[in-house]
Amino acid sequence: MSLHSKKSTSTVKDNEHSLDLSIKSIPSNEKNFSTEKSENEASESHVVDVVKDPFEQYTPEEQEILYKQINDTPAKLSGYPRILSYADKWDIMLQLAGTITGIGAGLGMPLMSLVSGQLAQAFTDLASGKGASSFQHTVDHFCLYFIYIAIGVFGCSYIYTVTFIIAGERIARRIRQDYLHAILSQNIGYFDRLGAGEITTRITTDTNFIQDGLGEKVGLVFFAIATFVSGFVIAFIRHWKFTLILSSMFPAICGGIGLGVPFITKNTKGQIAVVAESSTFVEEVFSNIRNAFAFGTQDILAKLYNKYLITAQRFGINKAIAMGLMVGWMFFVAYGVYGLAFWEGGRLLHAGDLDVSKLIGCFFAVLIASYSLANISPKMQSFVSCASAAKKIFDTIDRVSPINAFTPTGDVVKDIKGEIELKNIRFVYPTRPEVLVLDNFSLVCPSGKITALVGASGSGKSTIIGLVERFYDPIGGQVFLDGKDLRTLNVASLRNQISLVQQEPVLFATTVFENITYGLPDTIKGTLSKEELERRVYDAAKLANAYDFIMTLPEQFSTNVGQRGFLMSGGQKQRIAIARAVISDPKILLLDEATSALDSKSEVLVQKALDNASRSRTTIVIAHRLSTIRNADNIVVVNAGKIVEQGSHNELLDLNGAYARLVEAQKLSGGEKDQEMVEEELEDAPREIPITSFGDDDEDNDMASLEAPMMSHNTDTDTLNNKLNEKDNVVFEDKTLQHVASEIVPNLPPADVGELNEEPKKSKKSKKNNHEINSLTALWFIHSFVRTMIEIICLLIGILASMICGAAYPVQAAVFARFLNIFTDLSSTDFLHKVNVFAVYWLILAIVQFFAYAISNFAMTYAMEAVLQRIRYHLFRTLLRQDVEFFDRSENTVGAITTSLSTKIQSLEGLSGPTLGTFFQILTNIISVTILSLATGWKLGLVTLSTSPVIITAGYYRVRALDQVQEKLSAAYKESAAFACESTSAIRTVASLNREENVFAEYCDSLIKPGRESAIASLKSGLFFSAAQGVTFLINALTFWYGSTLMRKGEYNIVQFYTCFIAIVFGIQQAGQFFGYSADVTKAKAAAGEIKYLSESKPKIDTWSTEGKKVESLQSAAIEFRQVEFSYPTRRHIKVLRGLNLTVKPGQFVAFVGSSGCGKSTTIGLIERFYDCDNGAVLVDGVNVRDYNINDYRKQIALVSQEPTLYQGTVRENIVLGASKDVSEEEMIEACKKANIHEFILGLPNGYNTLCGQKGSSLSGGQKQRIAIARALIRNPKILLLDEATSALDSHSEKVVQEALNAASQGRTTVAIAHRLSSIQDADCIFVFDGGVIAEAGTHAELVKQRGRYYELVVEQGLNKA
């Protein structure tokens, strides 16, 4: 399906081309987006194919080029064989040691069965009146064996636990590294269809699944396998015929597993894929959070997110059914075979073919073996998840990228002249195959000359830069550098010769100095001394006109720029980016809209820097503001992928063609003299650039921009404060910036989401106390989300079924002890009858346990899936409830939020579902065996139970050790994940700077700390776990020794002894197994504490609040600022507004102008009530905006920003998303007509049902902007806010959009911010901001006459002729 007809090719935005071939959006049902899919679709790819063959219109050769750029490559090998291939020799040694010791530890229980058989013979002999004289000696002798086994099991358990944890972390670390390396190796076209949220999920949640499947659980599997195998070996040696009967359970159990695992695997893969898809949606929502606030779409977006969760829940329930039946079947077979074995064993015993020692030895050996197999079943989910998660990761790792900066192949580019030629280029974006962007396009860019590209959006300008950078390959024609085809050149060496400056420069979270050095290739940087490097940086800064303002910063070149440079203004970021571009003295300089979003003063300064940088090098410039390219050697006018005309500025004016019309549209043809006059005035002015405040650029700053994308990297303020105390206290305006400490030191782990609403100066201790809750509170909090009756019933039935499972152990003990008692009199006439009766008891127990385990697993998992889905939905809505201040904080990045919604919720499984069922099973077991043992024989019961605190204490300290390191591990891994997310979200910048190797190296370094922490944690926690494992055998020794004493004295009989022994020993053993879940419980408790903290935190501006004055419609929509003072909450030291006074009358169209950082966008933020002012008041209709109900108030306002936000879905869905109530088709069409977009929409293949693509990527800037205007108008707002609504558009698009805005402003109060003064000349009143106050106010004509600050802006833009 084509989103654009061929007639509209020229209007397609060429720089936004990420429409997925398999679009992850479904046509809507009325207002809400729909994400419902069939299970088959979701389990395979979770997408709906728009076309069968998107490239069918191209030749086979062209199709191959396109497919190579976007298609995935299925992994040649996946699963555990592939995972284990990442082990080096040390890992192999660790795993080998772990395997051997795991097997050694697994031998302990079967060996115990041998000892138990010998002791059982001695006890039955004593009960039948035989061997009384040697009884105590025999018992003492065999009790010593228990002690020897205990020592061996303790040592082996410790070794296998530690070695597998360490080896698992090391292997998972290499997979993480390989995955990021593969991601950084991909061509840019691959990222056009891959969501940033999906990368984050893969590198966090999925790699955590892999690590979990490689840790101590692997050791437990070898332990269980060894127990199983050795148990049967011992049993066969003791009596093969009897053991063969017991062995019949093995094929039956394997058959059940064989049927269940494939179904479980399929649904696990489906669930993982849906969660990854939902992460992309989360990233899309929170990247544009201000838009959600402005239009009040939180509930709609939450419902859309919930549809992803429902799909994931469906997979989880399907998985639960299979898991429940499989586990139930395993226990049914086990208990059924026990009944069969004792039935046949009694006959063999009666016939004299078997003695009691062999029968009991074989039984215990097989019993222990089968239990060991059953103990694997709860771990199976970890292994299935591990293998499923690895599949997607290895698909990416194995993908062969056609353009790979890591590959050494290709001719190395060294000394070049810099001549670029595009010859007969045919180009189409792989994710938009229906649009031919360049058609037989040819252009020569001479060496050392400036070539400028102009034309409408979608005409192919940015594509040319992408081809020169070799971000893409054309499907036809060639791109030459000095006569050599780019495809024959080494990619990295090619990009080392090129520097790119983009419209939205990306700076990294480090110092100004480091950001500039990133422009130097490593081959050069490594050869420079410290002094030479500093000289280069300073020279580059001076060339970029950045040196003077850098020297006024708090730490000068050592000043940290903040995440994505948000502490810098737009002009400052741009000039740092230019310095970064020119430091390597590139032969080729590419400038893509480098000044379009700047105010006039910044533009003049930046343009001078660009003019300086362009001298003596090949330069390609894209510009919508023609004033910036009038001096170019060759100006190329591009339209619909073809060159319309080219020549110098004057030559093209003489032609009076397309270029002349563009010039006329911008009213620049007569402005050269005035432009020169302004530049001369700037030359005469002092070189120090006036800075209102450090980074106080509320148009370009992430903190204040109304449509700023969320930053994707995180910091940890605690670690940071320590560093600041040591050396990095930054003082500015005589104030210590402790509260912006998280921006001063880069690349540190983020605070968890739970910490996000805390005051910056709170200590680590106070933060920890705020979040830390005990296990009971966490359990109550998680299950407080059980809401529906079916969930309550499932939870109660699941608990009851789990308790029945737990009660099996004491029932088994009572049956076994009484069964053993009949062996004391083999000559009894009713012996065989008694054997038959007890065999039936075993069969009944088998049937009960089948239903109990099946129902327990299914019911608990059903309830868990519902609860976790609801908690995830609740957390999503809670995050959407937070105010803008919350998202301004550096720790609340998109990466952190996406990770929290994925991994934190996943962690809650440790206190819910099957794990909770296991807890009730164990609790029931402990209580019931205690009651049974005390009722049967209180003396032996008390002595044996007195040892249980040893196991409990060992388990407690293991949990405590894990608890202490879990927080450090979580923060450290989140740091590395956030760094990876930041780098991949800025992949074009990373690629253009050729920084892939550096990013990869930094990421590898960031994984070292968590690896070290994991090793230390394993050494501590493994000690306590091993103690819990070994002490079981000591308890056996004590029980047999004391029991023998009681029996020898005649106080106990054999029934009493074996009832107490089996009940307590096996019961305590199972209690010890629960501590194997301690790591999961720790993670769940920490996650629940953070989510609970966030849930209970109330934002200052609360959209859930019902308080405040209700307003259905504003009366006059008059706006007044009275002595307003304001500082952003995260930058209290910087005053943005300093006593602002202004009045906007009802129905007026007013404009705010001024330099960056003067407070313009801040006023819109205050009108929208994104923030509350510090002093003074903002009044609308004479009422303080604080007194209105926030939701009712925002319904009266509509916002159109510089970067319009569109979501995945159809055009219709995106438009009606802005409606404050249900709207009719006619109302929607009327809004579109006013926005000048209706006719265009009708021309689309599916009209209003045409898909927009991710973030509206299939539409041009002008088209997206007009849809955003329609979305604003459908609200029928009383107040319309326009924040740089046309600044990033080309002249044609700007004209069309401006006409739509003019129509939209009729009959309502309109506030517009604009750098292009031509768009606001007709305003009723123009307010000129300067330093947070109004410097001038009046109409355009009045302000021009005053010859003040506004007049300077007019002259700078050549508008005084108007």
Curated annotation (Swiss-Prot):
Pfam families in alphabetical order: ABC_membrane, ABC_tran
Segments crossing the lipid bilayer: 92-115, 138-162, 220-237, 244-264, 320-346, 354-374, 789-809, 835-859, 916-935, 940-957, 1022-1040, 1054-1072
Role description: May be a transmembrane transporter of the mating factor, namely P-factor or M-factor. Confers resistance to leptomycin B and to several other antifungal drugs.
Annotated Basic and acidic residues bias: 33-45
Membrane topology: Multi-pass membrane protein
Biological process per Gene Ontology, one example term: transmembrane transport
Positions that bind ATP 1: G455, A456, S457, G458, S459, G460, K461, S462
Location(s) in or outside the cell: Membrane
GO cellular component: fungal-type vacuole; membrane; plasma membrane
Protein name per UniProt: Leptomycin B resistance protein pmd1
Binding site for ATP 2: G1154, S1155, S1156, G1157, C1158, G1159, K1160, S1161
Region (Disordered): 1-45, 748-768
Family, as annotated: Belongs to the ABC transporter superfamily. ABCB family. Multidrug resistance exporter (TC 3.A.1.201) subfamily.
Domain ABC transporter: from-to ranges: 420-665, 1119-1356
One Gene Ontology molecular-function label: ATP hydrolysis activity
Cited Gene3D superfamilies: ABC transporter type 1, transmembrane domain, P-loop containing nucleotide triphosphate hydrolases
Keywords: Antibiotic resistance, ATP-binding, Membrane, Nucleotide-binding, Repeat, Transmembrane, Transmembrane helix
Topological domains, Cytoplasmic: 1-91, 375-788, 1073-1362
SMART domains documented for this protein: AAA
Domain ABC transmembrane type-1, chain residue ranges per copy: 95-385, 795-1083
InterPro entries on file: AAA+_ATPase, ABC1_TM_dom, ABC1_TM_sf, ABC_transporter-like_ATP-bd, ABC_transporter-like_CS, P-loop_NTPase, Type_1_exporter
